[in-house]
Every structure is written in C-alpha cells, then in structure tokens.
C-alpha cells in the first residue's frame, strides 16, 4: 500500500474539513452550518490520521463540552447551537474511535 500516495490524494478532503471547523471546534457537515456528532467524529479521525493536532484537539474539546450530565450529545447542531433536541444513543460513544486513532499515532 502506498500510504503517502493515498494521503496526498485525499488532502483536498482534509483541507475541506479544516476550512469547515469553526472557532468553537465544531466541524460543519455542510456550508449551511450543520454539525452532527457522528460526522464530527469521522472528521476527527481524518485529522488524527493527518496529525493535524491543533484542529483535532479543538474538535475533541467541542465534543466533550457538548455532552450532557448523562453523557449524551444532541443529535444535530446548526450554527453552533443545538437544532435537534433529542439524542441518538450511538453518537456519544462514537468519540472513542477518534480517540483510539490518535492513541495509535502518538
């Protein structure tokens, strides 16, 4: 496998992720300001693979700041505020994947 070649080919996707990360650390799913925790975590995995640690750390901090006392996170955010006021049980534990990815690289 030519790891460097694949990383190079996917660099535009990484640039898109970085461009769509807001100052609060959330990573927008689209240009309209939507952010959902599942897609956010997938973007964190990419940031870890590319060792973009500043953006990665901001994204992890955003995720944990938005967990409630029960360890759940709202299903969707729009322009930095919750827009769907319910929880999907698989969103909160998904953060383990970007954390594990980072631990494998560090």
Predicted regions and their residues:
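Carbohydrate-binding/catalytic loop surfaces
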Residues: 24-42, 72-98
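Low-complexity, Ser/Thr/Pro/Gly-enriched N-terminal "stalk/linker" regions
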Residues: 1-38, 49-73
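Well-ordered alpha-helical scaffold segments within catalytic/enzyme domains
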Residues: 1-3, 41-55, 93-106
């Amino acid at each position: 496998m030519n790891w460097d070649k694949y990383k190079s080919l996917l660099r535009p996707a990484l640039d898109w992720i970085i461009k769509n990360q807001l100052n609060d650390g959330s990573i927008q799913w689209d240009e309209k300001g939507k952010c959902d925790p599942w897609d956010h975590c997938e973007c964190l995995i990419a940031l870890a693979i590319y060792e973009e640690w500043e953006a990665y750390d901001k994204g992890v901090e955003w995720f944990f700041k938005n967990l409630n006392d029960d360890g759940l996170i709202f299903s969707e955010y729009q322009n930095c505020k919750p827009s769907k006021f319910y929880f999907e049980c698989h969103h909160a534990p998904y953060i383990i994947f970007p954390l594990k990815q980072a631990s494998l690289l560090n």
